[in-house]
């Protein structure tokens, strides 16, 4: 397992789609992680001050998006790992999963994100939730 510095087990979910944001938050909280939410990269700034262990971020939303969103987030919290999520991965439109990984994302997941895939990626990157 490749654990990170920051607040162990603390995750920031950034997505402008309230349904997807709440769904991923519910899955992560249900697994025992502490989760904060934001609607876009600009709204995430305060939460990034807490140095979460992981950010799960949509790639297409208002404000910085795509590789620019990854650069923005990594610039604010370089130690924080990032999972990029997008409905555009594999569609030929916008950022590809490879682009996201090249920009600094540790993992890239296509929407609709599956619960098992998200939880497996999170556990691999930051370990199990704190007891």
What feature does the model see in each segment?
Residues 22-30:
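Charged docking surfaces used in two-component/phosphorelay signaling
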Residues 61:
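Receiver (REC) domain active-site loop signature in two-component systems and cognate sites
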Residues 46, 67-79:
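Short amphipathic alpha-helix used as the core "switch/output" element in two-component signaling
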Residues 1-12, 114-131:
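Non-catalytic signal-transmission and effector/linker regions of two-component phosphorelay proteins
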Residues 58, 86:
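Active-site residues of response regulator receiver
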Residues 68, 89-109, 120:
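Alpha4 helix (beta4-alpha4-beta5 surface) of REC/receiver domains from two-component response regulators
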């Amino acid at each position: 397992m490749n654990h990170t510095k920051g607040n162990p087990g603390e995750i920031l979910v950034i997505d402008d789609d309230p349904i997807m944001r709440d769904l991923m938050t519910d899955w992560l909280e249900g697994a025992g992680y502490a989760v904060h939410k934001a609607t876009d990269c600009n709204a995430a700034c305060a939460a990034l001050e807490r140095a979460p262990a992981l950010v799960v971020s949509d790639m297409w939303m208002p404000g910085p998006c795509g590789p620019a969103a990854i650069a923005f987030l990594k610039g604010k919290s370089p130690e924080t790992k990032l999972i990029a999520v997008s409905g555009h991965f594999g569609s030929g439109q916008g950022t590809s999963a490879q682009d996201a990984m090249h920009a600094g994302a540790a993992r890239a997941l296509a929407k609709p994100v599956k619960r098992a895939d998200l939880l497996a990626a999170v556990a691999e990157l930051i370990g199990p939730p704190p007891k």
